[in-house]
Amino acid sequence: LGPKIYGTPLIIGVNWLTLSIATYGISSYIFRHNTFIILFASIFMVFTDYIIEPLAGVLDFWHWSLDEIPIQNYIAWFFVSLIIQLILVKGNFKFNIKLCCALIFSQILFFIIQYFNYGLF
Protein backbone atom coordinates (compact mmCIF):
# COMPACT_ATOMS: atom_id res chain seq x y z
CA LEU A 1 0.00 0.00 0.00
CA GLY A 2 2.95 2.30 -0.41
CA PRO A 3 5.14 4.27 2.00
CA LYS A 4 4.65 3.64 5.71
CA ILE A 5 4.97 5.56 8.96
CA TYR A 6 5.55 3.34 12.01
CA GLY A 7 4.50 0.33 9.95
CA THR A 8 1.19 1.80 8.76
CA PRO A 9 0.74 2.79 5.10
CA LEU A 10 0.13 6.52 4.52
CA ILE A 11 -2.92 5.72 2.43
CA ILE A 12 -4.57 4.42 5.61
CA GLY A 13 -4.39 7.96 6.99
CA VAL A 14 -6.03 9.27 3.84
CA ASN A 15 -8.70 6.59 4.18
CA TRP A 16 -9.30 7.55 7.82
CA LEU A 17 -9.69 11.20 6.86
CA THR A 18 -12.21 10.20 4.19
CA LEU A 19 -14.09 8.00 6.67
CA SER A 20 -13.99 10.79 9.26
CA ILE A 21 -15.57 13.21 6.82
CA ALA A 22 -18.18 10.66 5.78
CA THR A 23 -19.14 9.75 9.36
CA TYR A 24 -19.29 13.44 10.25
CA GLY A 25 -21.53 14.11 7.24
CA ILE A 26 -23.90 11.30 8.20
CA SER A 27 -23.88 12.27 11.89
CA SER A 28 -24.53 15.93 11.21
CA TYR A 29 -27.42 14.93 8.94
CA ILE A 30 -28.99 12.79 11.69
CA PHE A 31 -28.22 14.99 14.72
CA ARG A 32 -28.25 18.73 15.34
CA HIS A 33 -26.48 18.80 18.70
CA ASN A 34 -22.68 18.87 18.37
CA THR A 35 -22.11 16.41 21.21
CA PHE A 36 -24.27 13.79 19.52
CA ILE A 37 -22.60 14.43 16.16
CA ILE A 38 -19.13 13.95 17.66
CA LEU A 39 -20.04 10.86 19.71
CA PHE A 40 -22.03 9.10 16.98
CA ALA A 41 -19.37 9.75 14.34
CA SER A 42 -16.58 8.56 16.66
CA ILE A 43 -18.46 5.38 17.57
CA PHE A 44 -19.17 4.80 13.87
CA MET A 45 -15.44 5.18 13.15
CA VAL A 46 -14.57 2.57 15.78
CA PHE A 47 -17.26 0.26 14.39
CA THR A 48 -15.72 0.65 10.93
CA ASP A 49 -12.27 -0.07 12.37
CA TYR A 50 -13.72 -3.16 14.08
CA ILE A 51 -14.75 -4.43 10.64
CA ILE A 52 -11.41 -3.57 9.02
CA GLU A 53 -8.93 -4.76 11.68
CA PRO A 54 -9.40 -8.54 11.40
CA LEU A 55 -8.70 -8.31 7.67
CA ALA A 56 -5.71 -5.97 7.89
CA GLY A 57 -3.22 -8.80 8.38
CA VAL A 58 -4.88 -11.05 5.81
CA LEU A 59 -4.73 -8.25 3.23
CA ASP A 60 -1.18 -7.37 4.36
CA PHE A 61 -2.17 -3.81 5.29
CA TRP A 62 -0.43 -4.11 8.68
CA HIS A 63 0.14 -6.74 11.33
CA TRP A 64 -0.16 -6.85 15.09
CA SER A 65 2.80 -8.29 16.98
CA LEU A 66 0.71 -10.90 18.83
CA ASP A 67 -1.66 -11.57 15.92
CA GLU A 68 -4.52 -10.24 17.98
CA ILE A 69 -6.00 -6.78 17.97
CA PRO A 70 -5.34 -4.99 21.26
CA ILE A 71 -8.26 -3.16 22.86
CA GLN A 72 -5.98 -0.11 23.06
CA ASN A 73 -6.27 0.15 19.28
CA TYR A 74 -10.02 0.74 19.49
CA ILE A 75 -9.71 3.06 22.47
CA ALA A 76 -7.03 5.11 20.71
CA TRP A 77 -9.08 5.33 17.52
CA PHE A 78 -12.09 6.47 19.52
CA PHE A 79 -10.10 9.36 20.99
CA VAL A 80 -8.43 10.20 17.67
CA SER A 81 -11.89 10.19 16.10
CA LEU A 82 -13.23 12.47 18.84
CA ILE A 83 -10.52 15.01 18.05
CA ILE A 84 -11.09 14.81 14.29
CA GLN A 85 -14.86 15.10 14.74
CA LEU A 86 -14.45 18.05 17.10
CA ILE A 87 -12.38 19.84 14.44
CA LEU A 88 -15.02 19.10 11.80
CA VAL A 89 -17.85 20.29 14.08
CA LYS A 90 -15.98 23.49 14.99
CA GLY A 91 -15.39 24.13 11.30
CA ASN A 92 -19.13 23.71 10.70
CA PHE A 93 -18.41 21.89 7.46
CA LYS A 94 -21.22 20.75 5.19
CA PHE A 95 -20.91 17.59 3.11
CA ASN A 96 -23.21 15.89 0.65
CA ILE A 97 -25.12 13.21 2.57
CA LYS A 98 -25.46 10.95 -0.48
CA LEU A 99 -21.71 11.02 -1.07
CA CYS A 100 -21.01 10.39 2.62
CA CYS A 101 -23.36 7.38 2.65
CA ALA A 102 -21.84 6.05 -0.57
CA LEU A 103 -18.31 6.34 0.87
CA ILE A 104 -19.21 4.47 4.05
CA PHE A 105 -21.27 1.86 2.23
CA SER A 106 -18.50 1.18 -0.30
CA GLN A 107 -15.87 0.82 2.45
CA ILE A 108 -17.94 -1.56 4.54
CA LEU A 109 -19.07 -3.53 1.49
CA PHE A 110 -15.46 -3.92 0.32
CA PHE A 111 -14.45 -5.46 3.63
CA ILE A 112 -17.53 -7.67 3.89
CA ILE A 113 -16.71 -9.03 0.43
CA GLN A 114 -13.14 -9.68 1.61
CA TYR A 115 -14.45 -11.61 4.61
CA PHE A 116 -16.29 -13.92 2.22
CA ASN A 117 -13.36 -13.98 -0.23
CA TYR A 118 -10.96 -15.18 2.49
CA GLY A 119 -13.49 -17.52 4.11
CA LEU A 120 -13.63 -15.58 7.36
CA PHE A 121 -17.41 -15.53 7.60
Model regions: which residues?
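Aromatic-rich, lipid-facing transmembrane alpha helices and their immediate juxtamembrane interface loops
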Residues: 1-121
